[in-house]
Amino acid sequence: MENFDQIFTLLAEHEGIGLNLNILETGLLNILTLVGILIYAGKDFLGSLLEERKTTIVKGVQDAEDRLNEAQKRLNEAQKQLNQANLVISEIRNETIATKKVLLESEVFGAKKDLKIRFERALAMFKSKERQIFLEIKQQIISLVLKRTVIRAQQAFAPKERATTLINDTINKLEGDLL
């Protein structure tokens, strides 16, 4: 705060702030000479630094462009591989679907064939049972007819010889019908 007061005191005593146009008193020549010497003497040094910096920047830009081109090439190659992989996946899916269809058709055909064989066996077994039952019924009917005939013959014909002959004739006729 003291310095601030001193500045105002000095300004008040010297009649304010003014511009000094005397070149020798201001040291402007010294500053310009110093800048000129620095430019002349530092031109080679500063030029080489700027040239190195320029070379480094250009090289960095070229490296970045090379990396960009390389990355672009790898991206294109990866996209080609992706497209090829998608084609292979699509082919595999199509082959899988075709194989599934063939397997299903084969299974359906096998199931139909198996069902047909089972149905034919069941039908043959049914016909066999039907024939067997028919023969058993026929045998029972013949047996009943023979028993009735024997009973009627015994009642109608008292003598044994006549009855035996009639029974034998009837049995022979019935056996002939069965065969």
Curated annotation (Swiss-Prot):
In plastids the F-type ATPase is also known as CF(1)CF(0). It is a single-pass membrane protein. It comes from the Eukaryota. Keywords: ATP synthesis, CF(0), Chloroplast, Hydrogen ion transport, Ion transport, Membrane, Plastid, Thylakoid, Transmembrane, Transmembrane helix, Transport. F(1)F(0) ATP synthase produces ATP from ADP in the presence of a proton or sodium gradient. F-type ATPases consist of two structural domains, F(1) containing the extramembraneous catalytic core and F(0) containing the membrane proton channel, linked together by a central stalk and a peripheral stalk. During catalysis, ATP synthesis in the catalytic domain of F(1) is coupled via a rotary mechanism of the central stalk subunits to proton translocation. The gene is atpF. Pfam families: ATP-synt_B. HAMAP family: ATP_synth_b_bprime. GO terms for cellular component: chloroplast thylakoid membrane; proton-transporting ATP synthase complex. Its main location: plastid. One of its GO terms (molecular function) is proton-transporting ATP synthase activity, rotational mechanism. F-type ATPases have 2 components, F(1) - the catalytic core - and F(0) - the membrane proton channel. F(1) has five subunits: alpha(3), beta(3), gamma(1), delta(1), epsilon(1). F(0) has four main subunits: a(1), b(1), b'(1) and c(10-14). The alpha and beta chains form an alternating ring which encloses part of the gamma chain. F(1) is attached to F(0) by a central stalk formed by the gamma and epsilon chains, while a peripheral stalk is formed by the delta, b and b' chains. The chain crosses the membrane at residues 26-42. It is found in: Plastid, Chloroplast thylakoid membrane. It comes from Phaeodactylum tricornutum (strain CCAP 1055/1). The keyword Nucleotide-binding does not apply. Belongs to the ATPase B chain family. This is ATP synthase subunit b, chloroplastic.
